[in-house]
Amino acid sequence: MASISVDQIRKAQRANGPATVLAIGTANPPTSFYQADYPDFYFRVTKNQHMTELKDKFKRICEKTTIKKRHLYLTEDRLNQHPNLLEYMAPSLNTRQDMLVVEIPKLGKEAAMKAIKEWGQPKSRITHLIFCSTNGVDMPGADYECAKLLGLSSSVKRVMLYQQGCHAGGSVLRIAKDLAENNKGARILTINSEITIGIFHSPDETYFDGMVGQALFGDGASATIVGADPDKEIGERPVFEMVSAAQEFIPNSDGAVDGHLTEAGLVYHIHKDVPGLISKNIEKSLVEALNPIGISDWNSLFWIVHPGGPAILNAVEAKLHLKKEKMADTRHVLSEYGNMSSVSIFFIMDKLRKRSLEEGKSTTGDGFEWGVLFGFGPGLTVETIVLHSLAN
């Protein structure tokens, strides 16, 4: 007869404390574009300068985004080398894939190296890898390629998330939380890498959503180290604790945000009702997440919100009567980098913790103890994570 029960084995396998974010790293392609200059570049490089009315409309779209600058992998030279990317809806999936399967892991590696350096521990301690990207589906995936680029153990346990979209930063943290809390001693490297080659399309009057995307999206990568029971004796310093994580889709929101992989790349649609759908349903998510803690004052929280666009942020702010400063870090990231899909929330988290330290705030969360992180994406899907800040 066995001397130990399954229950005892399971208890020994689990961590004692909550999952924590131990380090954050970010990266962008070196080429950046000022938003004010992008309409001229976009219509010139696609040889559509004759479409003056459409260009004027695109300029107005760019102005409404509140974006000042974005980083993009696609340069004029790269576009000219691949003329099928410049022709509206021309077959070009292979061209896009050839670039994406190489560049997505490379950009992810840049962010990962920064997170690992901040963490300060040997790469051999990384037990799990979660890699997420909207584009570049391949087998083996970007998780495998990046593990090799980083020199991770061949036995690292990998999870690959493709084509999740803008909510997937929250998805990655939710999965990392479960892995950290159910595997004692686990250290999870999360990587999100987004490059917009997959959704680049020439301007056309029949594809307004595509023009919105050309004005809104940017390229970037992020990485975190997640683990429970941080070992402060060896220098692990947690930034945030993850208290709860939930995912739901908004009822009756089919088709609000969707994307379809075609011969011409990823074609997506963003319904004009998205800001209203999110703002009408966000309080329900807040109540469900924060009732157990006894919090009902939304201004007593620090906020990390996916910057889907200014209309979404304005609608959420108005619905919840949030003070302007609550979205300041989110708006800063939108302004300086654009919407980087699943990557954006990590740039905001990084900005929040660094600003809190620079301004002498008592906690990593702008001096507040509790906070929320929201991801919004296709579905409409909402990811809600409750965070607990730590002393600076």
UniProtKB/Swiss-Prot annotation:
Keyword terms, alphabetized: Acyltransferase, Cytoplasm, Transferase
Gene3D superfamilies: 3.40.47.10
Compartments it resides in: Cytoplasm
SUPFAM superfamilies reported for this sequence: Thiolase-like
Tissue specificity note: Expressed at the same level in leaves and in glandular trichomes.
E.C. no: 2.3.1.-
GO cellular component assignments: cytoplasm
Active site: C166
One MF annotation (Gene Ontology) recorded for this entry: acyltransferase activity, transferring groups other than amino-acyl groups
Transmembrane portions of the chain: none
InterPro entries hit by this protein: Chalcone/stilbene_synt_C, Chalcone/stilbene_synt_N, Polyketide_synthase_type-III, Thiolase-like
Gene Ontology BP annotations: polyketide biosynthetic process
Pfam family, one: Chal_sti_synt_C
Top-level class of the enzyme under EC nomenclature: transferase
Family as reported in the entry's similarity comment: Belongs to the thiolase-like superfamily. Chalcone/stilbene synthases family.
UniProt function note: Chalcone synthase that may use malonyl-CoA and hexanoyl-CoA as substrates but without producing olivetol or olivetolic acid.
Identification of the protein by name: Chalcone synthase-like protein 1
Organism: Cannabis sativa
